[in-house]
Amino acid sequence: MSTAIRSGRQSNWEAFCQWVTDTNNRIYVGWFGVLMIPCLLAATICFTIAFIAAPPVDIDGIREPVAGSLIYGNNIISGAVIPSSNAIGLHFYPIWEAASLDEWLYNGGPYQLVCFHFLIGISAYMGRQWELSYRLGMRPWICVAYSAPLSAAMAVFLVYPFGQGSFSDGMPLGISGTFNFMLVFQAEHNILMHPFHMLGVAGVFGGSLFSAMHGSLVTSSLVRETTEAESQNYGYKFGQEEETYNIVAAHGYFGRLIFQYASFNNSRSLHFFLGAWPVVGIWFTSMGISTMAFNLNGFNFNQSILDSQGRVLNTWADVLNRANLGMEVQHERNAHNFPLDLAAAESTPVALQAPAIG
């Protein structure tokens, strides 16, 4: 009987595979990391160069370039990587599609380069979270939670431009550009009156409240292991089996502060709730952006209440509508003479009275 003896020497490819998937590395790489690292590096390098030195971009496609970089007079607040031109629309616009590098810069090519590499990179980051959890035998909920901010980024950088028909409608990569995107989004889609946005606000602010409540309750019910002269933090040893705080005391305090059933008596269900609340809220916001991308907008109650003489009784909805029109006439002011809402025919008010029959 012959026995096949495998050579003890490892090939370079096998050594590389072992290194990539080794969970003992200081920072886990993983196969998703092989995709993530170059994509995020490319996005970061291009963003940094463009934010500092990119020439003005013809964002509206009307030969009126908008400057966004620092060396063209902006500061950290006003600077941005300007979205690609409306003349490009939804066309894929890599460097080799332009006649020259100057043309690529003029039409906002860096915006597409940054966004596409960034979206691939953060998607791979989510895959890397799952991959590391799988190799360590953990449950997969970390990457599920991360899918909420990932879906939000996908909504504003990919889905919304697709729905509107041009990457020039994507969110600019800067602080004031983000605020401009929010104002224009409200003007065109009435997002404040969309239920999914309301759920997102509840998720973000509720998550902040619950996080602060949980942290303060735990910190206030620590089991003292030190003297008064020492910090309580020294009473905890990493990996210790004993509870570091008294959950019964925290439960009793909060149950008496609100009422008994407002307080969790199960640590696992408590932490699931803390994770699920903001995640579900941000999921809803992403779905709201994605539906409004195709102009399924927020509720519109403009001029919906009339008196017996048919005169409009203004409500908060009418105040909001006037603010929307003001924001709409101010943006892209040279790209069109009138915003669509003002150029359209007079709208028929919805009255709160039954029509006359016969």
Curated annotation (Swiss-Prot):
S-S bonds: none
Membrane-protein topology: Multi-pass membrane protein
GO terms of molecular function: chlorophyll binding; electron transporter, transferring electrons within the cyclic electron transport pathway of photosynthesis activity; iron ion binding; oxidoreductase activity, acting on diphenols and related substances as donors, oxygen as acceptor; oxygen evolving activity
Miscellaneous remark of the record: Cyanobacteria usually contain more than 2 copies of the psbA gene. 2 of the reaction center chlorophylls (ChlD1 and ChlD2) are entirely coordinated by water.
SUPFAM superfamilies in the record: Bacterial photosystem II reaction centre, L and M subunits
Site entry (Tyrosine radical intermediate), positions: Y160
Organism expressing this protein natively: Synechococcus sp. (strain CC9605)
Residues that, per the record, bind chlorophyll a ChlzD1: H117
Subunit description: PSII is composed of 1 copy each of membrane proteins PsbA, PsbB, PsbC, PsbD, PsbE, PsbF, PsbH, PsbI, PsbJ, PsbK, PsbL, PsbM, PsbT, PsbX, PsbY, PsbZ, Psb30/Ycf12, peripheral proteins PsbO, CyanoQ (PsbQ), PsbU, PsbV and a large number of cofactors. It forms dimeric complexes.
Cellular compartment(s): Cellular thylakoid membrane
Propeptide: 344-358
Lineage: Bacteria, Bacillati, Cyanobacteriota, Cyanophyceae, Synechococcales
Segments traversing the membrane: 28-45, 117-132, 141-155, 196-217, 273-287
Described purpose of this protein according to its UniProt entry: Photosystem II (PSII) is a light-driven water:plastoquinone oxidoreductase that uses light energy to abstract electrons from H(2)O, generating O(2) and a proton gradient subsequently used for ATP formation. It consists of a core antenna complex that captures photons, and an electron transfer chain that converts photonic excitation into a charge separation. The D1/D2 (PsbA/PsbD) reaction center heterodimer binds P680, the primary electron donor of PSII as well as several subsequent electron acceptors.
One Pfam family this sequence matches: Photo_RC
The protein's name in its UniProt record: Photosystem II protein D1 2
Tagged with keyword Electron transport: yes
GO biological process assignments: photosynthetic electron transport in photosystem II; response to herbicide
Recorded family membership: Belongs to the reaction center PufL/M/PsbA/D family.
